């Protein structure tokens, strides 16, 4: 009966399937729109530059591609001769990869448009208010600060990957009725699997090392959406238990299930027994492939949810999810990494003196505070990968930037430093940011000295405060005016308050290394 109820729930939500406009792939303006829709020339300009042509020739390649797509047997030729790298009947390896990338990117853009229109139309019908401030990544941390201080347990979840490519097609099959589009998607995934082992270091095909990002990002988002879709259903089913009266719930579950073993239900244990069986309210936060599940329940309750998730991924997506990808810990003694921050709960014991008439009492209490700091080792590791410092944190020069002008070098280092300071403005300890600023500042000085074949001391004496101003963020300038005692150029004089900004829509590249 319960299985039937779950099936009806899934069919009810998925009943509104979206028709896919397959003929759009034969329209030239779709490829032009795909190029302007955020590709930044990744599939049109880079290949033509390698071929020695100008950028206008991309329209010629699009027309050539559409003509080949109209051929009756292009998919058959491509499938039967996949070992020869033939695509759309073309023997040239470069054009085969290039045409495939053009179609896959346009395919992804069309799906994005259709599902975006569907989302907008549904939100207009429901009159859902749009809160643009909540688009910021930093808006997650005030939510965690408000909720986690009252919770006990947390599950650190890594969403399983990779999954079988056919599962991605089946996920879209629930929402797309156009069969040719699904066959085309299967064809792309099959070709990508073959090409993935054929990429070499040749300059002519180097551009394909970052191909099809839009398509696979879209498929991954649909996969995550499917996971969260069923998770919300399980959450709704568990929340129903909270609406059940305590007495009825105890009678149905506890009394009849344990009547053979319990002779008397003690009144003192009544609340504890009810708390064990009721389903505490849970909080779920996710970014990219990492999610956090926090609850006020017991460790046994979190283990039940872990079992639910593992079985769900196993039976719903038909692949085994390693249980060790879900870590259950107590919030009181656990620190977790999320969105580049190291977060934890700080417990500060306090003694409060209470005076009542002639009697006084000392009350011991504990204040819980959600704390976020910028981790030192991951940031230095990211700077090391980007060739700004060594693994020990010693600044080094950036040889690839020595051909730039002095203004460009200083501007690049300054923008990186300001972006990191802006992103980690919510850190309660600024010492890590001071160290990162120090590394970037002296890496900039070493790069300038290397470009002019001089010493670092010479440039530091010549530029002085001018170089330091480039690493001085706007918020620090404003706060230096508000708090005059803070010296503008003192590394240890900056503010210690945490600030969350509402204009950060993506994680910093150095944070995401």
From Swiss-Prot:
It comes from the Eukaryota. One of its GO terms (biological process) is tRNA processing. InterPro entries: Domain_X (IPR024937), Maturase_MatK (IPR002866), Maturase_MatK_N (IPR024942). Belongs to the intron maturase 2 family. MatK subfamily. This is Maturase K. One of its GO terms (molecular function) is RNA binding. Usually encoded in the trnK tRNA gene intron. Probably assists in splicing its own and other chloroplast group II introns. It is found in: Plastid, Chloroplast. Keywords: Chloroplast, mRNA processing, Plastid, RNA-binding, tRNA processing. HAMAP family: MatK. PANTHER family: MATURASE K. Pfam families: Intron_maturas2 (PF01348), MatK_N (PF01824). GO terms for cellular component: chloroplast. Coiled coil: none annotated.
